[in-house]
Curated annotation (Swiss-Prot):
Description of how the protein assembles with itself and partners: Homodimer.
UniProt name for this protein: Nucleoid-associated protein HAPS_1040
Pfam families: YbaB_DNA_bd
Membrane spanning residue stretches: none
Keyword Cytoplasm among record annotations: yes
Classification via NCBIfam families: DNA_YbaB_EbfC (TIGR00103)
Function: Binds to DNA and alters its conformation. May be involved in regulation of gene expression, nucleoid organization and DNA protection.
Amino acid sequence: MFGKGGLGGLMKQAQQMQERMQKMQEEIAQLEVTGESGAGLVKVTINGAHNCRRIEIDPSLMEDDKEMAEDLVAAAFNDAVRRADEMQKEKMASVTAGMQLPPGMKFPF
């Protein structure tokens, strides 16, 4: 049922993958991603843990409508979160690649 190595081999693979995933999560938390809105007028940089690191607002927005600037900050933050999530999925997929799971079993369990 479990192929070469049996259940013991599968458990060893799972333990190794867990260690790799923990290391990858630590690395991801250190990475930074920047989201933009308003054609780059507002930029929000977050880390892999979705903590806001920096907000950049083009000075021309300060002369305009406050409500528009607030909307652009929210849109840039949401763009940064989306990009961070995509980056995290790509990085984690590389960790689970190559593990021979039984048919129908997915990770994380």
